[in-house]
């Protein structure tokens, strides 16, 4: 399911919260700048921001023909497909729960866990300030809570991401 893979990669690499993901539109993505715009109208911290868009995500978006949709379409409409109608933010969790059940994963693994892991991995690879900025945390202490919760893993120092698309 490539659309769900896209949602997972967005959560992990961009660190955009699920509710915010549900409000993103195709036009919020800049291929030239390799960024995603998060509007203050739906961001948790009520501030406009741009976050980096990993090249693996762009490659998958191109493969899924995301940029053939009108710019005013929501990136994740119903069934995670680009649509003029916004999909409910809970669709990410529902899809995750189905996958988790099939894979027989423990309930401790949540869709939001991808953001936690992304923050930790990015901080270990590029530094806590880069992770703070990508996660749009107002204070580095918030970012440190994510890192301390999971512990620092030396193996992530050569971070190229754990979710790949070839």
Enumerate the predicted regions with their spans.
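Short polar/acidic secondary-structure junctions
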Residues: 27-29, 41-43, 66
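Short, basic (Lys/Arg/His-rich) helix/loop patches that form interaction surfaces
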Residues: 1-4, 14, 51, 67-73, ...
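Short, charged phosphate-coordinating catalytic segments
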Residues: 11-33
């Amino acid at each position: 399911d490539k659309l769900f893979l896209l949602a997972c990669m967005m959560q992990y690499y961009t660190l955009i919260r699920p509710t915010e993901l549900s409000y993103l539109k195709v036009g919020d993505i800049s291929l030239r700048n390799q960024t995603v715009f998060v509007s203050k109208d739906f961001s948790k911290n009520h501030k406009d921001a741009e976050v980096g868009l990993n090249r693996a995500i762009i490659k998958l978006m191109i493969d899924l023909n995301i940029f053939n949709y009108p710019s005013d379409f929501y990136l994740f409409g119903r069934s995670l497909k680009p649509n003029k109608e916004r999909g409910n933010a809970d669709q990410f969790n529902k899809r995750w729960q189905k996958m988790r059940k099939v894979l027989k994963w423990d309930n401790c693994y949540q869709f939001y866990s991808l953001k936690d892991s992304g923050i930790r991995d990015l901080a270990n690879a590029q530094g806590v300030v880069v992770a703070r900025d990508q996660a749009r945390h107002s204070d580095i202490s918030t970012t440190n809570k994510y890192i301390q919760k999971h512990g620092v893993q030396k193996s992530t120092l050569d971070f190229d991401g754990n979710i790949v698309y070839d």
